[in-house]
């Protein structure tokens, strides 16, 4: 599954 960018 794609990883969501964390800011």
Swiss-Prot record:
Q: In which tissues is it expressed?
A: Expressed by the venom gland.
Does this entry carry the keyword Transferase?
no
Here the disulfide bonds are none
Tell me the compartments it is located in.
Answer: Secreted
Keywords, A to Z, come to: Cytolysis, Secreted
**What cellular component terms from Gene Ontology apply here?**
extracellular region
**UniProt keyword Secreted, yes or no:** yes
Q: Name one GO biological process term.
A: killing of cells of another organism
The UniProt function text for this chain reads:
Presents moderate hemolytic activity at physiological concentrations (micromolar range), and weak lactate dehydrogenase (LDH) release from mast cells. Does not induce mast cell degranulation, and antimicrobial effects. In vivo, injection into mice causes moderate edema formation, but induces very weak or no change in nociceptive sensibility. It also causes an alteration in rearing (standing on hind limbs), but does not impact locomotion.
Q: What is this protein called?
A: Cryptide Pep-9
Per the UniProt record, the source organism is Tityus obscurus
């Amino acid at each position: 599954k794609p990883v969501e960018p964390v800011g």
